[in-house]
Amino acid sequence: LSISEPVIVNVLQEVSKDKGRYSQWDEKDIFEFARALRLRSKPIVIAANKADISTAKENIRRIQATGRIVIPCIAEAELLLKRAAAKGVIEYIPGDPTFKVKDHALREEQKRALERVRILMQEYNGTGVQQSIDATCFNALNLIVVYPVEDADRLSDKDGNVLPDAFMLKQGSTAKDLAMHVHSELAEHFLYAIDARSKQRLGAEYRLKDRDVIKIVSAR
């Protein structure tokens, strides 16, 4: 099930506070532990699609009342925006709360469709699609984004590409963990890392922060 020991221990400690020794647990106690472990180790984010239909708001409120992570989504609007952006009709970056029309020579039906999408986006602060991905990565899975670079001054790789890669790692990951994700040999011959912003030298056990830009220095 890919559940780490620290997670199991943490859930055990939380559940067992008022239950005494594990050997004395009954079936109800075991079920409560199993449920808590599942919720902690396999979090669920609900992308509540079709949030624009009339019954959606009440359904979303009802699910949110259970404490679950629920993101209202309008996937059809996201698809329309991406297609329009690909054709140069609008400027839109996934996750933005609105968009800008570039081509004003649109048919009336196209204008109405875009205006309808704009109104929905104002209500939900976007289409909810990118927000669902963000909530899954950063809230449910507690991931961080780290940028490895070869040139700490130019923030680039050896070919001059600025911030060429982005790695999503678990919170608590170290500089050496990043090296392993880039290449196993970097981790094997790891010497130290450099924070590209502060130019500070970092050890193997340095705990990475979200949006760190890191250069790995190895013996090879």
Which residues make up each language-model segment?
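C-terminal-of-GTPase-core extension/linker across diverse P-loop GTPases
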Residues: 1-220
